[in-house]
Amino acid sequence: MKSLLRAVLCALLLVAGALSAPSAQPAHAAAPPSAAATGTAEAWTPPLSTRGRYIVDAQGNRFRLRSGNWDGAQGSWNGSGDRDDPATHHSGQNAHGIPIGLDRVPLPALLADFRAAGLNSIRLPFSNEMLRDTAPVPDSAVAANPALRGRTPLQVYDAVVAALTDAGFAVILNNHTVTTRWCCGLDGNERWNSGRSTAQWADDWVFLARRYRDNPRVVGADLYNEVRRDVFDDPNWGLGDNHDWHAAAQEAADRILTEANPQLLIVVEGINWFGLPVDGFPHGRPTLTPVRTLSHTLVTSNKLVYSAHFYGYTGPRHSGATGIGETSDLRYQDMTAAELEQTLYDQAFFVSAETGTHFTAPVWISEFGIGADESGAAPRAWFDRLTGYLTRSDADFAYWPLVGWSTTAQGTPGGDTWALLRYDTAGRRSGVLDPGDWRTARWSPLTTTPGRTGPVPATPAWYQLTTDHRDHNASLRTRAAGDWDSGARKAVCPDGARLTGLAHTGGRGLCTTSDLRAPTGGHTVVRDERYVPAGGDWATGYTKFQCPAGQFLIGYSLRGERVSAALCAPARTALPAGGRTVWFDRGDNRPAGGPGGDFALGNYKGQCLPTEYAAGIAFTTRAATRPSPAALLCRPLPGPAAG
């Protein structure tokens, strides 16, 4: 029924658009012919998921996000003055809390231009305030789309989502701001929980994800935009407090996947800024650098995408300000080509480039951009270098912003010169599809240069478990069975994975993909040595929590540092016995190359070989000795098919 409603809505919009198109002259020049800009929708099958560094469709074929940011629903008001005065809005453009341009161009024509620009996906920002705004938008805000008159901002957003997806675009929802106003500075929208709780923020995400769950081309939830310092406090990645962006993203992601839509990609942007931008004081733009040592393991595997933003006027330690708030640190546009490439790698691209680690994931550069009127040599060189790097890296990307004005409401020159596609009051277009825009020479190779296509084979994945501040139960099957060790901190591998490594201290673990588990049956909680057979002492003098025969480790629990229990699951096939003891209480004991990456930085770690499964944990409660994990029992897997 909802698919039918979307189709009807799209048809109405097509008719309304045809009736209301400006008649002064054709508004849209023909697009230059190219492989990515043929005017036809790219063939792909939802939902999307991930395989290593790539996003793939339901057939396992690579789907590269070639995206634009269609902003407006997050707000355009600058935060002071009369909201009805265009001068108080970014670049003089009053979006009225809906995607910009609907006052000037019929939706079908806009979507045709998006396709001509080589795009297959749209990042669609919204504000939490927009979700609750019950006032209809002014008729003038949708003048070119009269079918949208009388609708609230959320209802207009619904119509835009339906039109985009019915036209074949993938849509990634982006929580950009809390209040409907322009981002980003000290604006009250610095964190996901600015002016509200993390639970309330996650509630909004569950609401919106449920709203579109019957539309399979709504493919992703981009959790929050440019998390940054407010007046008094910094965000952090892993401290466990109310400002912990890593933990908040984990909470919202798991709620979206369990309560709303398990098919969505979850997009997590790194931290955009911390500290005071004053020389001599700690400050900077961490972006994705913390992911190397603390990544996310979600309850639904192969759904995680990391994202980052890059603008030439900012830098790794430069706020982007001029005057107050400016430091002597390098901007990206001040770097040499080699410096820029190394910085891009260190801040973001290592996540996708370094395969076979717990943090390996697709990286989406979900914002970058520059003005069509930019004449400076350094900013232009930066844009050339960045787009070249994105092309050579075969990266997923989203330009900011996609749509803007070229004239004011009065018809005089104005609007956002950064927009990829600009429209005057008559709907006439200018931008990268038209003569005279210097950016076209950089944009076209980015969207048309062939990258990887076709099937992407599944490869072993690695998952980090952390009990730093709370439980980390990534298994839906285990969650459904209830609390298996009340009062202890618990960690469980995702369904379809097995435990393969543990840290001696710190409570972290490492899992890897495995189809070893039986499709039915529960789990076994091991709190003593009852399953250690006579003559099978594999860690003399140590307490051994060993899985029953035919079972393997999927989780563990701790009380303080002390091992509390081991969690085991039955295998779908007979498991070999025997094995070896892997000690790690006095140093690392891992396979060559450290597959999975450093999952517990600064702590001793033990890990079974990729050809082994873990069947037991040993520890001691002797005086003056840590009661934390000290050894693993590693046994050979039954064969390649079971690994």
PLM segments and residue spans:
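Extracellular glycoside hydrolase catalytic/binding regions
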Residues: 47, 90-99, 103, 195, ...
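Active-site-proximal beta-strand/loop segments in catalytic clefts of secreted hydrolases
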Residues: 68-73, 125-129, 174-178, 222-227, ...
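N-terminal carbohydrate-binding accessory modules
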Residues: 29-121
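Aromatic-rich peripheral "rim/lid" segments of glycoside hydrolase catalytic domains that contact
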Residues: 375-460
